[in-house]
Amino acid sequence: MPVVISLLRGVNVGGHNPIRMEALRAVYESLGFHDSQTYGQSGNVVFQTKERNLPRLTKQIEDAIERTFGFRPAVIVRTPAELRDVIARNPFAERRGIEPNKLLVVFLVGSPDENARAKVLAIKTDPEELRMEGRELYMYFPEGMARPKLSWMAIEKMLRISATARNWNTVTKLLEMAVNLDSKR
């Protein structure tokens, strides 16, 4: 059975859209998914499913969350191969001194059009850095994320595409979980 990683947008952020991870796992199990595992409190779920159509899978999850919790977060799904590719494409990987807790990956629902992409890449970001690779943005905050000059939410509005961000440590942990779950097959 294929393994899938889902990332929920805007869950348990600033007291908004609260979901207990135990309840979220129960929703996934009710959809017929197997071995649902969560990581952190922001709606990261690694699970197995027979469903191979990712857009249909995404809609099933969004519908079930809306029925159960009364709100509909965007759900972004990636396969382990796609997440492995996200890690491999990290434009900051070869640079010395990059701190993983200051690196954010913004996962986009789809690919932005060229006009939106050009607008985002034209943003002056110094000292922060922004790179766009496929359906992901990589943002590095050398001075930390407490008071960033660069807002991924503002960028999301420019792109006109739903997105959710995860720090580098979370991204690598989710791949580790997916690989471990996949090895149980």
What feature does the model see in each segment?
Residues P2-S42, V46-R185:
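Surface-exposed, charge/polar-rich loops and edge strands
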